[in-house]
Amino acid sequence: MADKIMAVTGHRPEKVGGYSDEASKRLTTFAEEMLKFYKPEAVITGMALGWDQAVAQACINLKIPFLAYCPCKEQDRKWFPESREMYRYLIPFAKEVFYAVPGTYPGAWCMQVRNEMMVDDSDYLAALYDGSPGGTANCVAYAQQMGKEIKQLWDPWQWFLANRC
């Protein structure tokens, strides 16, 4: 099952196991399995904490090109030092880096601009989404509005946690 360009959206660490190294490794392992199953030619990630960065790391591990669609420059400016370090490690591996808006963080709306760019430039969306409101929900809603196929990963993630960890 090979599809072309996959965009990803998903929750921050608080909803997918936390900030520990162990939680990050679990999420990255799940991302690797998801990528092996769907076999995208390339992946678009928004580079947010949690799922987005786990997918970027999985792409590096599997040698799948990824495009970093960042909401703005200095997206990481309010993050913990360890999170900034990871972001700055991942970015140079991106095939290309795009910024949704010029300049530094102008407000949360730039994340939705980024989400729309990701959906518009992809063939389908893979969403690690539990149904709660927020940025992931907004991205999924936009993909639905645009008629994009959405691969919902929350149930497979729950199965993975129960059976593989």
Language model features with spans:
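Acidic/glycine-enriched connector segments
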Residues: 1-165
